[in-house]
UniProtKB/Swiss-Prot annotation:
Function per UniProt: Involved in dapdiamide antibiotics biosynthesis. Ligates fumarate and 2,3-diaminopropionate (DAP) to form N-beta-fumaroyl-DAP. Can also form N-succinoyl-DAP from succinate and DAP, with lower efficiency.
NCBIfam families: fum_diaprop_lig_DdaG (NF041596)
Keywords: Antibiotic biosynthesis, Ligase
Enzyme Commission number, as recorded: 6.3.2.46
Protein name in the entry: Fumarate--(S)-2,3-diaminopropanoate ligase
Organism: Enterobacter agglomerans (Erwinia herbicola)
Gene: ddaG
Length: 396
């Protein structure tokens, strides 16, 4: 199905059912009305772990596969794109980036770590006619700085946590005309600070929203001052308590569900992203419905985003193996994950064992720490009264 085509939900669900028999069975079990989105089952992490991420998927056509960090099973996720999925993704990202950048930019650099966006960034910029430098995330941070200062890109595509680390060195000596961000939550205040640092306007910073499962999802529309969903994505935002009945969240946000009409080789029908979204709205623009939101507060429930994702199940397992029966919560400090544990003291060997277990399950994070792109994992002792919330159930 092509982007912008009038999309028939029932036909699309039938296509997904034909590709994924387990999903067809799910529809039969639920007795779902295929023409009503709200009647369709939710695609959760649990279902995908059982049927997709580690399954021997068989597809009728050529495909591309990408790995991301571990799930509750301890294995890395594998996500598939058909040739058509890939084509639509590349075209959509290129259209957004080209519209943002305009003409006259000849050099582009991507420093994105791992994943689908990192693997395709070079192709997008080359199609725009740019000379391209792709920085290998395994390089030490000094080499990232050397490439940037030598190449002096007009367009710099990176992740907020990487950019923070680069700026903190005080050694950057280039002035990009456009900065494109992807990955971590980048508040407008944070974007403004980045613009000030590089002596550019806030409108010259573009924040993209995407995931390896869906691909391109949304972008910050400076004219609207809101994030705008891509045209082939049908978003829903549902109350937190509808998915997590025990949650005590009382804010204005809700959990984002996504249905994509541009993903043949992923069951993107009411996919539970676990992203907490505020200010969700829709309006009619030129005869078509446009969906927008004010901001993403981060990831709710089972994952703590640390560039890639360090799964809360991994953290729970590491603590259970090495320091059981202690309350804990999580924080960020200087680009690194902090695990705050209710304890008077923790032996050094226990701290190292916890970190070893986490990094063994998340090798991409281990490499990024080694390269100096993100801060090391810290274990901090605190009084039990300082522990905030039950992170085994939620995190945002």
């Amino acid at each position: 199905m092509n982007k912008g085509e009038n999309m028939n939900l029932e036909m699309w669900v039938q296509n997904i059912s034909a590709t994924f028999p387990w999903y067809a069975q799910l529809l039969r079990d639920k007795q779902a009305d295929l023409s009503r989105l709200e009647s369709l089952p939710l695609i959760t992490e649990e279902l995908l772990t059982q049927h997709y991420y580690h399954a021997e998927n068989s597809f009728p056509g050529e495909h591309h596969s990408y790995l991301t960090s571990g799930t509750t099973s301890g294995k890395r996720k594998r996500i598939f794109y058909s040739d058509n999925d890939q084509r639509i993704y590349l075209q959509q990202r290129m259209d957004i980036i080209r519209d943002f950048c305009g003409e006259g930019h000849t050099r582009a650099c991507a420093d994105l770590g791992t994943g689908h966006a990192a693997a395709t960034a070079g192709e997008i910029f080359q199609a725009m006619g740019c000379d391209v430098e792709l920085i290998d995330f395994t390089r030490p941070i000094e080499q990232h700085i050397e490439v940037l200062n030598r190449f002096k890109p007009d367009i710099f595509f990176t992740m907020p946590m990487i950019l923070d680390s680069l700026i903190a060195t005080g050694k950057l000596d280039f002035q990009p005309k456009r900065i494109i961000l992807l990955g971590d939550v980048a508040s407008l205040n944070w974007q403004n600070k980045v613009a000030d640092y590089f002596h550019i306007q806030p409108a010259q910073v573009l924040d993209l929203f995407g995931s390896i499962e869906i691909g391109s999802i949304a972008f910050y529309n400076h004219a609207q001052k809101r994030y705008q969903f891509d045209s082939y994505v049908r978003p829903e935002v549902v109350p937190v308590q509808s998915l997590y009945p025990g949650a005590k969240y009382g804010g204005d946000g809700g959990i984002l569900l996504l249905t994509s009409f541009a993903r043949e080789y992923f069951p993107a029908v009411r996919f539970v992203t676990n992203d907490l979204i505020e200010g969700f709205a829709q309006e009619n623009v030129g005869g078509r419905t446009v969906y927008t939101y004010q901001r993403c507060l981060g990831r709710f429930a089972g994952e703590f985003k640390h560039g890639e994702k360090i799964n809360l199940s991994d953290i729970s397992d590491a603590l259970a193996n090495n320091l059981p029966y202690h309350k804990y919560d999580l924080a960020d400090h200087e680009g690194g994950l902090v695990i705050r544990i209710a304890a008077k003291s923790i032996p050094t060997e226990v701290i190292e064992a916890i970190k070893h277990d986490l990094l063994a399950r998340n090798p991409d994070i281990a490499q990024m720490i080694s390269s100096g792109l993100v801060g090391d994992i810290r274990i901090q002792c605190v009084d039990a009264q300082e522990i905030t919330g039950n992170v085994s159930k939620r995190r945002y």
